[in-house]
Protein backbone atom coordinates (compact mmCIF):
# COMPACT_ATOMS: atom_id res chain seq x y z
CA UNK A 1 0.00 0.00 0.00
CA UNK A 2 1.41 3.36 -0.92
CA UNK A 3 0.59 6.65 0.72
CA UNK A 4 1.22 10.23 -0.24
CA UNK A 5 1.57 13.40 1.80
CA UNK A 6 -0.86 16.18 1.08
CA UNK A 7 -0.34 19.68 2.54
CA UNK A 8 0.10 20.73 6.19
CA UNK A 9 1.53 17.41 7.34
CA UNK A 10 -1.56 15.39 6.50
CA UNK A 11 -1.02 11.81 5.38
CA UNK A 12 -3.43 10.50 2.77
CA UNK A 13 -4.23 6.82 3.35
CA UNK A 14 -6.52 4.17 1.89
CA UNK A 15 -8.98 2.99 4.55
CA UNK A 16 -11.15 -0.12 4.29
CA UNK A 17 -14.30 -1.19 6.11
CA UNK A 18 -13.84 -4.28 8.27
CA UNK A 19 -15.98 -6.62 10.31
CA UNK A 20 -13.67 -7.19 13.27
CA UNK A 21 -15.15 -8.94 16.32
CA UNK A 22 -14.26 -7.32 19.66
CA UNK A 23 -15.20 -8.18 23.24
CA UNK A 24 -18.30 -6.17 24.16
CA UNK A 25 -16.95 -4.33 27.22
CA UNK A 26 -13.67 -3.48 25.51
CA UNK A 27 -15.66 -1.96 22.64
CA UNK A 28 -17.77 0.11 25.03
CA UNK A 29 -14.64 1.48 26.72
CA UNK A 30 -13.07 2.25 23.33
CA UNK A 31 -16.19 4.05 22.12
CA UNK A 32 -16.34 6.09 25.31
CA UNK A 33 -12.67 6.97 25.02
CA UNK A 34 -13.10 8.00 21.37
CA UNK A 35 -16.00 10.23 22.40
CA UNK A 36 -13.91 11.75 25.21
CA UNK A 37 -11.16 12.60 22.70
CA UNK A 38 -13.73 13.80 20.13
CA UNK A 39 -12.58 11.37 17.46
CA UNK A 40 -13.97 8.39 15.60
CA UNK A 41 -13.49 4.86 16.89
CA UNK A 42 -11.45 4.07 13.78
CA UNK A 43 -9.11 7.01 14.35
CA UNK A 44 -8.65 5.98 17.99
CA UNK A 45 -7.84 2.38 17.02
CA UNK A 46 -5.37 3.50 14.36
CA UNK A 47 -3.57 5.65 16.91
CA UNK A 48 -3.45 2.86 19.50
CA UNK A 49 -2.09 0.38 16.96
CA UNK A 50 0.54 2.78 15.57
CA UNK A 51 1.77 3.43 19.12
CA UNK A 52 1.82 -0.31 19.90
CA UNK A 53 3.78 -1.07 16.72
CA UNK A 54 6.54 1.21 18.06
CA UNK A 55 6.39 -0.18 21.60
CA UNK A 56 4.89 3.06 22.95
CA UNK A 57 1.97 3.56 25.30
CA UNK A 58 -0.87 5.36 23.50
CA UNK A 59 -2.16 7.05 26.68
CA UNK A 60 0.25 8.53 29.20
CA UNK A 61 -1.56 11.61 30.49
CA UNK A 62 -3.37 11.31 33.80
CA UNK A 63 -6.67 12.63 32.41
CA UNK A 64 -6.92 9.90 29.75
CA UNK A 65 -5.81 7.19 32.17
CA UNK A 66 -8.49 8.32 34.64
CA UNK A 67 -11.16 8.30 31.92
CA UNK A 68 -10.09 4.78 30.93
CA UNK A 69 -10.27 3.61 34.55
CA UNK A 70 -13.72 5.19 34.95
CA UNK A 71 -15.02 3.65 31.71
CA UNK A 72 -13.66 0.22 32.68
CA UNK A 73 -15.48 0.47 36.01
CA UNK A 74 -18.73 1.71 34.42
CA UNK A 75 -18.77 -1.07 31.81
CA UNK A 76 -17.48 -3.83 34.07
CA UNK A 77 -14.23 -4.43 32.23
CA UNK A 78 -12.50 -6.28 35.05
CA UNK A 79 -9.46 -7.72 33.26
CA UNK A 80 -6.37 -6.29 31.64
CA UNK A 81 -3.56 -7.14 29.25
CA UNK A 82 -2.72 -10.30 31.17
CA UNK A 83 -5.95 -11.81 29.82
CA UNK A 84 -5.24 -11.04 26.17
CA UNK A 85 -4.39 -14.60 25.13
CA UNK A 86 -7.03 -16.26 27.31
CA UNK A 87 -10.23 -14.68 25.92
CA UNK A 88 -12.70 -17.18 24.46
CA UNK A 89 -16.23 -16.73 23.15
CA UNK A 90 -19.06 -17.32 25.61
CA UNK A 91 -21.83 -19.77 24.84
Language model: regions and residue ranges:
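Short hydrophobic alpha-helical segments that form membrane-spanning helices or hydrophobic packing faces
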Residues: 30-31, 45
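Short amphipathic alpha-helix starts
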Residues: 14-30
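Short, basic amphipathic alpha-helical segments that act as recognition/interaction helices
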Residues: 37-65
Amino acid sequence: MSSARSGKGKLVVDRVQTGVRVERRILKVLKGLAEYHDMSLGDLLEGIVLHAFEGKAPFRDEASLQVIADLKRIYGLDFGAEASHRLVDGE
